[in-house]
Amino acid sequence: MDIEFRAARSDEAALISDLAMRSKAHWGYSADFLDAVRLELTYSPQVCSSGSLVVAERSGRILGFYRLVEGVPESCLDSLFVDPSAIGTGVGRALLERALLAAQAVGARTVTLEADPHAEPFYAKFGAVRIGEVPSESIPGRLLPHLRFDLAE
């Protein structure tokens, strides 16, 4: 797979935010739901240029991204989104593997995340375990799976 990874740039904020919305819409959510999560899925130029947001691209086209908040002993996978046209092609796996390696490189022993319920099976396939549920910041009453990866020493 000829995917290249690099830090996002501030001038890509709108493109990255649009990709996140299209990826979320892939799961068949209603327009009202998507409007409710729009702010949460909007990435500022500052976030994009912070170094915590990494894009996967092929031939200059962004196929997906992740944002890792590094910490020791625990890092947080704040987001991971794949362009709908690239879902099922290995891009998500490549992004996840890269994020977990980055967390391990800074000394994290675990990586936690709040997953979309539709994405929980994807993360479980790669070893994530559910450690609870957390309330959605955008949708009152909605609970999200709280997952954890235990990293090898």
Q: What is each stretch, according to the model?
A:
Residues 123:
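Conserved active-site tyrosine of GNAT-family acetyltransferases
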Residues 109, 114-118, 126, 132, ...:
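C-terminal "cap" of GNAT-fold acetyltransferases
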Residues 52-64:
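Conserved beta-hairpin
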Residues 4-18:
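A short beta-loop-alpha structural element at the N-terminal edge
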